[in-house]
């Protein structure tokens, strides 16, 4: 898995590669920071889009670190006209709630009164920031582990994967179909088979494939080595908005049906993916030396401190229009979540999932897997 941030077709050239240093800790500095450019395997045939103007950025563009080890917050920013037009939610979606069990949103919390359940759940005490260029998670500024780091493999980020125009068109097409109320203030659209994960059964009767507007997205994924053989059989669109208090709890995606790679396209606004692990044991840390981050990439510093896994949360900044790929430990061992505090404007995500080995060639369910792929890649789907 590459530790570098890959660049989408519309990427511009950037400035200095690394964040500024302050007392041994990387400080997010959008004006001087860049990510290493990794070109796709081949150019996009027939692509006549204009290249974006050069701009300075960093792996956590649009974010600021608090002085204390508190959660990352997003900077508010004005939205362009196209996005604003696409982002206006229908008024009626703010009057209903789809929460069940212990999960809540702002709508049902106001109706029920009292503190929301999540306020009483254990909070992670040590926060680290993931740096895409190194593949390491670094202790947040002025935290107990400021300047300490550990390797965090299995995350690939492709920035500017779609253009602003493509983003606006995709969201407009999504909004033409109905959104279903979901848990924790989200709305959703599913393109995939009906699945009972508990009984490990699925039905294909209502599945007509991925939506037509995803055909180009899936084709473009194949231009990158990490996704060159990626063939999704399911797409889940999720709609988040601050007015509903939208969020998603820490979770691991199923591994019976879904395969090695989870791929998610982040639209309309930046956010933060928060990753945590409940496993016992400790993480070994390295003290970032004066040569950070190159020394970390080379593995030149021996571990000299540890922290309990259960107390760690890793923040992975997701820029607007970026594509995230999770594999390996990041896919199977670290739970991922989107906290309510990291939704400051409407956000739409499109998550694509591939089949597990059981449904691939030589697997026990290879015939069913072949049928699912044929349906999926017809791109004639409507939300199920």
Predicted regions and their residues:
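Serine residues within intrinsically disordered or low-complexity segments
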Residues: 2, 16, 43, 54-57, ...
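Non-heme Fe(II) oxygenase metal-center motifs and adjacent flexible, charged/small-residue loops
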Residues: 3, 58-384
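Low-complexity, intrinsically disordered segments with a bias for serine/threonine
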Residues: 6-9, 20, 37, 47, ...
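Compositionally biased, intrinsically disordered low-complexity segments enriched in Pro/Arg/Gln/His
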Residues: 13, 17-26, 49, 64-65
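Generic low-complexity, intrinsically disordered segments
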Residues: 26-47, 51
